[in-house]
From Swiss-Prot:
One of its GO terms (biological process) is symbiont entry into host cell. It is found in: Virion; Host nucleus; Host early endosome; Host Golgi apparatus. Interacts with major capsid protein L1. Interacts with E2; this interaction inhibits E2 transcriptional activity but not the DNA replication function E2. Interacts with host GADD45GIP1. Interacts with host HSPA8; this interaction is required for L2 nuclear translocation. Interacts with host importins KPNB2 and KPNB3. Forms a complex with importin alpha2-beta1 heterodimers via interaction with the importin alpha2 adapter. Interacts with host DYNLT1; this interaction is essential for virus intracellular transport during entry. Belongs to the papillomaviridae L2 protein family. It holds the Pfam family Late_protein_L2. Its main location: virion. Keywords: Capsid protein, Cytoplasmic inwards viral transport, Disulfide bond, DNA-binding, Host endosome, Host Golgi apparatus, Host nucleus, Host-virus interaction, Late protein, Microtubular inwards viral transport, Phosphoprotein, Viral penetration into host nucleus, Virion, Virus entry into host cell. Highly phosphorylated. This is Minor capsid protein L2.
Length: 465
């Protein structure tokens, strides 16, 4: 069997050795100069290039290709191919700009402007009247030539529906001198659009039945806190510090720093593993703002907390949502009292106070039970008795007093039943006279006590049966 030669492991490059051994100071002597370019050859090229330039010879540490132009003799030049070139001229002649000329070149050609507005009326020119002045007191003589019939000139203007000109008011010109009157009557066409009346969609009425166009404000819907969802843990807190300073239940107090407890969300950072003062607040990273709610007849102070029980490699914290609450005071339900009407229909009548009659229901007289066996099948009855009441003295005047019927009061009546044992015996009745409070029992009623004897046996040993 042929012996297999061991393969030679390749040595690491100088750059790889330099990265690991530079800090430790264990680099071979030929690694640092090669990487930092401080060898003898590098020093010669560095200082020799200051006085000699070998740029076109292609001398360097690269591959021997002769550079970009290749190897050429020192006494000759490489041949160059000449191609006919055309003279480049600007397509448009450029005007020269003098030092005093404006450097702003207008890129927009001059266009004709159209004056907007109504057309200006043409005013005819006339020579007017010839006025002769004289210093003599002679009457003025004016020669008026007959003009003849006056001509009327009409101008018609058509409106462009796609363009509406602004209305321009121009003063009327007086042309009575020449005897010509100018009238301008634009043509008015009927419009093609539809007139729609405006309606009020939101109308509110005040207490004085005054209609206004201000919209009625609606209450903003309250957001649900989700304190009692299935994924929220419910924890009841008994410590009163939960209301004023909940930070004491999560972190330990610092005597040199006493922060205020605002009514907003509190955030906590746990750099090391340390237990909380209250075990219910372990791993709490956020404690949200408080909320007052009413549930099951109590006023409840609630805060929603977030825990960071687990932390992934990406830095995301995963934990449960906890609802911490503390009941402040119970809400006592109102007593349900049946209310009676306070007022009834009032009837007024003129009468005297002494003449008032009142109805009183009287209980019937209970008859003495007789020794007869008879069953009553009828219900008890009440009688209505009218009793006049007097105040003891009469008033000399009569007044109008409103009368209100009072409630009817029925007195309870005991049920009627027949006893099993008659109160009065049916046998011959004998009178019994009692002269004292003591009595003597007849000797025949005394029973003699007899003692019953039981045989007892005592033994110190076990007796065989």
């Amino acid at each position: 069997m042929r012996h297999k030669r061991s393969t030679r492991r390749k040595r690491a490059s100088a750059t790889q050795l330099y990265q690991t051994c530079k800090a430790a100071g264990t680099c071979p002597p030929d690694v640092i100069p090669k990487v930092e370019r401080t060898t003898i050859a590098d020093q010669i090229l560095k200082f020799g290039s200051l006085g000699v330039f070998f740029g076109g010879l292609g001398i360097g540490t690269g591959s021997g290709t002769g550079g970009r132009t290749g190897y050429v003799p020192l006494s000759t030049r490489p041949p160059t191919a000449s191609a006919p070139t055309s003279t480049i001229r600007p397509p448009v002649s450029v005007d020269t700009v003098g030092p005093l000329d404006s450097s702003i070149v207008s890129m927009i050609e001059e266009t004709s402007f159209i004056e907007s507005g109504a057309p200006a009326p043409s005013i005819p020119t006339a020579s007017g009247f010839d006025v002769a002045t004289s210093a003599d007191n002679t009457p003025a003589i004016i020669n008026v030539s007959s003009i003849g019939e006056s001509s009327v000139q009409s101008v018609t203007t058509h409106l462009n529906p796609t363009f509406t000109e602004p209305s321009v008011l121009r003063p009327f010109s007086s042309s009575e001198a020449s005897g010509h009157l100018i009238f301008s009557t634009p043509t008015i066409s009927t419009h093609s659009y539809e007139d729609i009346p405006m309606d009020t969609f939101i109308v509110s009425t005040t207490s004085d039945n005054v209609t206004s166009s201000t919209p009625i404000p609606r209450p903003r819907p309250t957001a649900r806190l989700g304190l009692y969802s299935k994924g929220t843990q419910q924890v009841k807190v008994v410590d009163p510090a939960f209301l004023t300073s909940p930070r004491r239940l999560i972190t330990f107090d610092n005597p040199a720093f006493q922060p205020t407890e605002p009514d907003e969300t509190l955030y906590f950072q746990h750099q090391d593993i340390s237990p909380a003062p209250d075990p219910d607040f372990l791993d709490i990273v956020a404690l949200h703002r408080p909320a007052l709610t009413s549930r099951k007849g109590t006023i409840r102070f609630s805060r929603l907390g977030s825990k960071a029980t687990m932390k992934t490699r990406s830095g995301k914290q995963i934990g449960a949502r906890v609802h911490y609450y503390q009941d402040l005071s119970p809400i006592v339900p109102a007593d349900s009292i049946e209310l009676q009407p306070l007022s009834r229909p009032v009837s007024s009548a003129s009468h005297s106070i002494n003449d008032g009659l009142y109805d009183v229901y009287m209980d019937p007289d209970t008859p003495f039970p007789q020794p007869s066996i008879s069953y009553s099948l009828h219900s008890p009855q009440t009688t209505n008795v009218t009793v006049p009441l007097s105040s003891g003295f009469d008033f000399p005047f009569s007044s109008t007093v409103p009368l209100q019927p009072g409630p009817d009061i029925v007195s309870p009546v005991a049920p009627t039943y027949t006893p099993f044992v008659p109160v009065i015996p049916t046998s011959p009745f004998n009178n019994v006279l009692v002269y004292g409070s003591d009595f003597i029992l007849h000797p025949s009623y005394f029973l003699r006590r007899r003692r019953k004897r039981f045989p007892y046996f005592f033994a110190d040993v076990r007796v065989a049966a």
